[in-house]
Amino acid sequence: PIFTFASNVPADTITGFFL
């Protein structure tokens, strides 16, 4: 997902923080 601040996936977490 895009807004995933509590994801276990590093890339997903970074994307969430950046977006």
Curated annotation (Swiss-Prot):
<keyword id="KW-0413">Isomerase</keyword>
<comment type="similarity">
    <text>Belongs to the MIF family.</text>
</comment>
<keyword id="KW-0202">Cytokine</keyword>
<dbReference type="GO" id="GO:0005615">
    <property type="term" value="C:extracellular space"/>
</dbReference>
<comment type="function">
    <text>Tautomerization of the methyl ester of L-dopachrome.</text>
</comment>
<dbReference type="GO" id="GO:0004167">
    <property type="term" value="F:dopachrome isomerase activity"/>
</dbReference>
<protein>
    <recommendedName>
        <fullName>L-dopachrome-methyl ester tautomerase</fullName>
        <ecNumber>5.3.3.12</ecNumber>
    </recommendedName>
</protein>
<dbReference type="GO" id="GO:0005125">
    <property type="term" value="F:cytokine activity"/>
</dbReference>
